């Protein structure tokens, strides 16, 4: 069939659906890894649509919305021969076949914790690398599985983002922090009226994100709060009276608390 046509239709469909994570277990065989990378980048950068994809061997990904899964997984399957003996067959899951499982880990991991070292108990082994090779791979934005002596686990939960800029720093390399940032973007920014309650919700989410950065040693401290000076300047620039707690006043007559509570319109 027309694989390109199917992919185009799929991308068009998902542009109007709500989801966070995507995996396509035939994407490498179909020769469409780069197309999905470009599409995810476009959705994130141009449409503020914070989707993410787990893709196999997406070495040119370099995007916080792309997880570059690069390990083979193995599962031992036992069949009964009927003569008191069994045959154990080792089944290999290529990187592309493993992507749905990895996407499932990210989608199912609580926002308060990282997927780093998450166990994959449904597999019996993984493509093994020595620690130096693992560190090198992780440093180039590859997500790996590793064998800890007892079970298969995820290595450090990194995104494929590697080329840092003044705007995007090392925090974009960590899947957990990207999830936090996406949640702030998706759940709050531009979605709610700028009421005091909604501002408090946004500030709580951003401060939770900052706390993760502090815990990871990425920043020493960070807090978000309502900027009273900017908010007062904005209200005055509108040139209109403001109603706060049932009272209508000119912006310059508002107390600091009233400025904080005032609705400042949409984002």
Task: Set out the residue ranges of the language-model regions.
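Structured, hydrophobic secondary-structure cores that serve as assembly/anchoring elements
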Residues: 101, 105-128, 132-267
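Extracellular Cys-Trp
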Residues: 1-118
């Amino acid at each position: 069939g027309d694989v390109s046509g199917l992919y185009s239709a799929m991308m068009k469909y998902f542009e109007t659906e709500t989801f966070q994570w995507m995996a396509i277990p035939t994407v490498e065989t179909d020769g469409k890894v780069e197309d999905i990378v470009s599409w995810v980048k476009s959705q994130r950068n141009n449409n503020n649509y914070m989707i993410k994809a787990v893709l196999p061997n997406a070495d040119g990904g370099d995007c916080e919305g792309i997880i570059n899964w690069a390990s083979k997984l193995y599962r031992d399957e036992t069949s009964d021969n009927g003569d008191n003996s069994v045959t154990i067959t080792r089944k290999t899951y290529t990187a592309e076949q493993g992507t749905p499982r990895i996407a499932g880990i990210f989608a199912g991991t609580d926002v308060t914790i990282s997927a780093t070292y998450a166990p994959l108990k449904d597999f019996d082994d993984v493509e093994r690398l020595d620690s130096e090779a693992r560190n090198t791979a992780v440093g180039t934005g590859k997500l790996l599985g590793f064998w800890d002596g007892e079970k298969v686990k995820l290595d450090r939960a990194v995104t494929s983002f590697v080329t840092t800029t003044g705007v995007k720093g090392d925090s974009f390399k960590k899947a957990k922090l990207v999830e936090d940032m996406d949640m702030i973007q998706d759940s709050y920014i531009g979605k709610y009226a700028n009421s005091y309650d909604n501002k408090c919700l946004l500030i709580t989410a951003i401060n939770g994100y900052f706390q993760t950065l502090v815990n990871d040693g990425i920043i020493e401290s960070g807090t978000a709060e309502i900027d009273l000076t900017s908010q007062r300047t904005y209200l005055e620039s509108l040139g209109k009276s403001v109603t706060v707690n049932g009272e209508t006043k000119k912006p310059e007559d508002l107390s600091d608390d009233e400025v904080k509570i005032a609705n400042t319109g949409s984002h």
